[in-house]
Amino acid sequence: MKMTFLQSLCAVVLCALFSMPALATPDLANGKTIDQQKCYGCHAKKSGFGNGDMIYTRSDSKVKSLANLKKMVALCNTELRLDLFPEDEADVTAFLNQQFYKFKP
């Protein structure tokens, strides 16, 4: 009986550990690649100047916090059907924050 309980407990703990992508270290290189392939072109059109980075650095930016940046990346992913996994969203968020926003975690 104890062995079954311990096995069940181990299984639950392992499942919990594998289901916590938010604790994983973001892959900045992947975030940059995704930004260049799936975000830059649309942002370049929206800026009106052909520079996709301008949307991140404009003075009237809607992004005022790291939490807001995460929401904006998720919104773009959903609305534009970019097919990004949650880990990819985290990578893009981390890249944009490091490159442009510099919000404290």
Regions found by a protein language model. Name each.
Residues M1-C10:
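Bacterial N-terminal signal peptides that target proteins for export
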Residues L28-K32, Y40-A74:
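Gly/Gly-Pro-rich "capping" loops immediately C-terminal to redox-active cysteine motifs
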Residues Q36, A44, T78, N97-Y101:
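Residues at helix-coil transition
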Residues Q36, L66-A74, E89-T93, N97:
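An amphipathic alpha-helix signature
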Residues S61, N77-L80, P86:
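Long, charged/polar, soluble alpha-helical segments
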Residues L82-P105:
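C-terminal capping alpha-helices of c-type cytochrome domains
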